[in-house]
Protein backbone atom coordinates (compact mmCIF):
# COMPACT_ATOMS: atom_id res chain seq x y z
CA UNK A 1 0.00 0.00 0.00
CA UNK A 2 1.39 3.39 -1.00
CA UNK A 3 0.57 6.19 1.41
CA UNK A 4 1.43 9.86 1.77
CA UNK A 5 1.07 12.79 4.12
CA UNK A 6 -0.39 16.15 3.09
CA UNK A 7 0.40 18.62 5.91
CA UNK A 8 -0.74 22.19 6.40
CA UNK A 9 -2.24 24.66 8.81
CA UNK A 10 -5.59 24.59 6.96
CA UNK A 11 -6.50 27.91 8.59
CA UNK A 12 -8.93 28.06 6.89
CA UNK A 13 -9.57 24.99 4.76
CA UNK A 14 -9.92 26.18 1.16
CA UNK A 15 -11.25 24.79 -2.11
CA UNK A 16 -7.62 24.70 -3.22
CA UNK A 17 -6.77 22.37 -0.32
CA UNK A 18 -9.73 20.11 -1.10
CA UNK A 19 -8.73 20.00 -4.78
CA UNK A 20 -5.22 18.88 -3.82
CA UNK A 21 -6.63 16.29 -1.41
CA UNK A 22 -8.96 14.96 -4.12
CA UNK A 23 -6.15 14.68 -6.66
CA UNK A 24 -3.79 13.11 -4.14
CA UNK A 25 -6.41 10.57 -3.03
CA UNK A 26 -6.63 9.36 -6.65
CA UNK A 27 -2.86 8.73 -6.72
CA UNK A 28 -2.30 7.02 -3.36
CA UNK A 29 -3.91 4.16 -1.47
CA UNK A 30 -3.97 6.21 1.74
CA UNK A 31 -3.63 9.96 2.33
CA UNK A 32 -3.14 11.42 5.80
CA UNK A 33 -4.07 15.09 5.91
CA UNK A 34 -2.21 16.45 8.92
CA UNK A 35 -3.13 19.71 10.61
CA UNK A 36 0.17 21.15 11.76
CA UNK A 37 -0.16 23.02 15.04
CA UNK A 38 2.16 25.91 15.87
CA UNK A 39 1.94 26.37 19.63
CA UNK A 40 3.44 29.86 19.27
CA UNK A 41 0.57 31.12 17.09
CA UNK A 42 -3.13 31.29 17.64
CA UNK A 43 -4.90 30.57 14.39
CA UNK A 44 -7.99 32.32 13.10
CA UNK A 45 -9.89 29.04 13.45
CA UNK A 46 -9.39 26.71 16.44
CA UNK A 47 -7.56 23.47 15.60
CA UNK A 48 -10.53 21.31 16.61
CA UNK A 49 -12.76 23.20 14.18
CA UNK A 50 -10.21 22.84 11.35
CA UNK A 51 -10.11 19.09 11.95
CA UNK A 52 -13.91 18.95 11.96
CA UNK A 53 -14.12 20.93 8.70
CA UNK A 54 -11.51 18.71 7.04
CA UNK A 55 -13.30 15.53 8.12
CA UNK A 56 -16.53 16.84 6.64
CA UNK A 57 -14.88 17.98 3.40
CA UNK A 58 -13.03 14.67 2.99
CA UNK A 59 -16.04 12.38 3.40
CA UNK A 60 -16.13 11.68 -0.37
CA UNK A 61 -12.60 10.26 -0.15
CA UNK A 62 -12.64 7.02 1.87
CA UNK A 63 -8.86 6.65 1.68
CA UNK A 64 -8.25 10.01 3.39
CA UNK A 65 -7.81 10.32 7.14
CA UNK A 66 -7.29 13.45 9.22
CA UNK A 67 -4.61 13.81 11.88
CA UNK A 68 -2.87 16.62 13.76
CA UNK A 69 0.65 17.25 15.05
CA UNK A 70 2.25 19.91 17.23
CA UNK A 71 5.90 19.16 16.53
CA UNK A 72 8.32 19.12 13.62
CA UNK A 73 7.04 17.65 10.38
CA UNK A 74 10.19 15.51 10.02
CA UNK A 75 9.48 13.99 13.44
CA UNK A 76 5.89 13.24 12.40
CA UNK A 77 7.07 11.49 9.23
CA UNK A 78 9.57 9.44 11.23
CA UNK A 79 7.14 8.49 13.99
CA UNK A 80 4.39 7.50 11.55
CA UNK A 81 6.89 5.71 9.28
CA UNK A 82 5.66 7.68 6.27
CA UNK A 83 7.91 8.03 3.24
CA UNK A 84 6.07 10.45 0.93
CA UNK A 85 5.25 14.07 1.74
CA UNK A 86 2.93 16.04 -0.56
CA UNK A 87 3.17 19.81 -0.81
CA UNK A 88 0.98 21.99 -2.99
CA UNK A 89 2.59 24.92 -4.77
CA UNK A 90 0.90 27.93 -6.35
CA UNK A 91 3.88 29.81 -7.75
CA UNK A 92 7.57 29.68 -8.56
CA UNK A 93 8.38 31.48 -5.30
CA UNK A 94 6.60 28.71 -3.38
CA UNK A 95 8.71 26.12 -5.20
CA UNK A 96 11.81 27.87 -3.86
CA UNK A 97 10.35 27.94 -0.32
CA UNK A 98 9.44 24.27 -0.52
CA UNK A 99 12.92 23.40 -1.76
CA UNK A 100 14.39 25.10 1.31
CA UNK A 101 11.96 23.27 3.60
CA UNK A 102 12.81 19.99 1.88
CA UNK A 103 16.52 20.58 2.44
CA UNK A 104 15.94 21.33 6.13
CA UNK A 105 13.76 18.24 6.53
CA UNK A 106 16.45 16.08 4.92
CA UNK A 107 18.91 17.25 7.59
CA UNK A 108 16.47 16.12 10.29
CA UNK A 109 15.25 12.87 8.70
CA UNK A 110 16.36 11.35 5.41
CA UNK A 111 13.68 8.66 5.25
CA UNK A 112 11.10 10.45 3.13
CA UNK A 113 10.68 12.23 -0.19
CA UNK A 114 8.83 15.47 -0.85
CA UNK A 115 6.61 15.63 -3.94
CA UNK A 116 5.39 19.02 -5.16
CA UNK A 117 1.93 19.12 -6.71
CA UNK A 118 0.99 22.27 -8.66
CA UNK A 119 -2.30 23.80 -7.61
CA UNK A 120 -5.18 24.08 -10.04
CA UNK A 121 -4.69 27.50 -11.72
CA UNK A 122 -8.41 28.24 -11.34
CA UNK A 123 -8.14 27.78 -7.57
CA UNK A 124 -4.82 29.48 -6.89
CA UNK A 125 -6.36 32.40 -5.01
CA UNK A 126 -8.99 30.42 -3.09
Report each predicted region and the residues it spans.
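Nucleotidyltransferase catalytic core that binds NTPs
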Residues: 1-126
